[in-house]
Amino acid sequence: METEAFPPFFPLMNLRRIPYYARVVVCGHLCNGLWRSRLERRRIRGRAIRKAADAYLRPYGAAAAAVPEDAPDRSGSRRVFSLWLQGEAQAPPLVKACLASMRRNAGAEVVVLDERSLADWVDLPEGILRKWKEGRMKPAHFADICRLELLYRHGGVWMDGTDYLDTPLPAWLWEADFFVYLGGDRLRGAYSGIQNCFIRAAKGSYLLKVWREAVLAYWEKEDSAVDYFVHQMLFGAAVAANPRAAALYAEMPALVQDPTHVLWYEWADKPYDEARLHAICAPALFQKTDYKTDAARSPRPGTFADILLAPYR
């Protein structure tokens, strides 16, 4: 997934962001020599974005510095939440396949919400709803807020509609107060810090609480995302500003997201084999997919993509 390093005409859009974009342009592009390999240039660009974002987001992280801590409540939180704003019936075949895999394999109640049913589960701040309805907030960033609110109110596991689940969620996950995969090296993960398409949080999780505080502080003041991965980077800002959150984060299992991107990004166009499917999925809790890829839109016959999508086309 490509990042939005800087939107067009950015100085005219938000004057406070000029230092952020200037640093990204100078350090991530102008001083990023073409003699370097593509991978190295990408890493340098990612580091520049991360440093610029850390400075820009620091005030929002500070909003979470003194959040009071409550005892986590793990009772009644064996529930998986997902969201497809247009409604599951309108979802692409790959999303339908992923949601079906959750219901088949999660070993927990699966709740799939849409824009209409969302209000039955959470009360979103009026300012957030207004920005969403006025088109100032992209669907992805609105969904970022929704997942935190759902887990904050109810506890459970959040899974994106493009997460494929091959085996039941393990006991250790349900026993954890909080878990996310770390960014790793795939898909700009190194500068996003964490993955946010799969989140476990018990009701009352302190890490989720400080993350939510930073996110709400950001969107109360901002009208757009400074970067596509602003949600993940706000987690980093909140943890950096809160010693208790930093201590809890250090205790979390340090698993990188790389093994969650194997099935779709390496095998979608290859001949299907059931034993191979289970072997690919085994090293990770789930597999991230992408309904916008050619493999999802026009799968070649007999491939992993074709077999997984066949019942839903």
What does each of the following model-derived ranges do?
Residues M1-A143, G161-R313:
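Glycosyltransferase-associated regions of secretory-pathway enzymes
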Residues D144-H154:
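Small-residue hinge/turn detector
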Residues H154, M159-G161:
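Active-site acidic Asp-centered loop
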